[in-house]
A protein has these predicted regions:
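N-terminal secretory signal peptides and thylakoid transit peptides that target proteins
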Residues: 1-18
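Ligand/cofactor pocket segment of small-molecule handling proteins
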Residues: 149-206
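Active-site metal-binding motif and surrounding structural segment of the metallo-beta-lactamase
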Residues: 57, 68-112
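Metallo-beta-lactamase
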Residues: 117-160, 164-165, 173-174, 214
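C-terminal regulatory/interaction regions
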Residues: 260-297
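Divalent-metal (often Zn2+) His-rich catalytic cores of metallo-beta-lactamase-fold enzymes
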Residues: 204-260
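Active-site neighborhood of phospho(di)ester-bond hydrolases with catalytic His/Asp-centered motifs
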Residues: 62-64, 86-94, 112-114, 179-181, ...
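Conserved beta-strand hairpin/beta-sheet module of binuclear metal-dependent hydrolase folds
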Residues: 34-76, 170-171, 176-182
Length: 297
């Protein structure tokens, strides 16, 4: 049973959270919509985490999962805002982040992505004869781009190759919340998209730049997490992801040096030594990506 001090402490925390997120006290969102602060939050259902900025007058959506999930997210937005969405931003081109774009076709003013994201998405759509089922960016980012809203500034910044060759970080500057897309998989084996321009070496460097660029108070949203871990993270989680990639690099290079084949390493590996928090399915993808990058070193 809670004592009075614990009760008052919890009540104060809830009150403070509501103050940071006035929308929470006015509207009833679905359980998979979480507002963090400064009218910025995220939506989870199936696929990569959707980020959002939401007021009665303006809104921003980051990534869209799949059409059904995008429609559900749009319904949440419509509880607050009936206006056109100001910005739809894609962190990268993968289908679990972009397949829902088409749902926003007639209700968004501007679609933004890195130039390589647009190239990759168009290439994939054409290969699948599905260009009409996709919504491509009309505004592309090369190094950085900023967008001004009434009460928020949104910066999209490219730090370099990582999960693909077109990953951007989207920073709500006033709220000081940054959506990382799939540059961080929180304690979950990552997809390292070699055909899409991924590089383990470059990913490690990209994460270093991110850690140094944002301040100690920045809250981060990542695209995926182990079911035991959150998608709302901090710099220590980015460092943990960086450590995973570094330990993967060390491990694969040693296996190559020892003369082991990719198949032999897959057969014997369930975790990456030095990054034991990463468990479950998916280590095979990391091994394959590692061999693609380091087998001819």
């Amino acid at each position: 049973m809670k004592n009075r001090r614990e009760f008052l402490k919890q009540s104060a925390a809830i009150a403070g959270f509501a103050w940071l997120n006035p929308l929470m006290s006015q509207f009833s969102f679905a359980g998979n919509m979480t507002m963090i602060r400064g009218n910025v939050g995220y939506y989870t259902e199936r696929g990569g985490t959707i980020g959002c900025y939401l007021t009665k007058d303006q809104s921003v959506v980051i990534d869209t999962q799949f059409p059904e999930q995008a429609a559900n997210m749009l319904a949440e937005i419509r509880k607050v805002n009936a206006n056109k969405i100001n910005l739809l931003i894609n962190t990268h081109h993968h289908g679990d982040h972009t397949a829902g774009n088409i749902v926003f076709k007639d209700v968004v003013d501007k679609v933004v992505s890195h130039e390589n994201c647009r190239i990759n998405l168009e290439k994939t759509a054409l290969a699948q004869n599905a260009l009409d089922k996709n919504l491509l960016a009309d505004t592309v980012v090369i190094d950085k781009a900023s967008f001004k809203l009434a009460k928020e500034s949104v910066e999209c910044r490219y730090f370099g190759r990582g999960h693909t060759n077109g990953d951007i970080v989207v920073h709500f500057e006033n709220a000081n919340i940054a959506h990382l897309g799939d540059l961080v998989f929180n304690r979950r084996f990552p997809f390292i998209d070699v055909p899409g321009g991924a590089s383990i070496d470059q990913w490690i460097e990209t994460l270093e730049k991110i850690v140094k660029y944002y301040d100690k108070d920045t809250i981060f949203i990542c695209g995926h997490a182990n079911e035991k871990y959150p998608v709302q993270i901090n710099k220590s989680d980015i460092r943990a992801m960086q450590n995973y990639l570094d330990k993967l690099r060390i491990y694969i290079k040693q296996q190559v040096k020892d003369g082991l084949t990719e198949e032999a390493v897959i057969a014997k590996t369930t975790i990456i030594p030095g990054a034991e928090e990463w468990t479950g399915d998916g280590v095979v993808r990391s091994i394959k990506a590692g061999f693609a990058e380091y087998k001819t070193m």
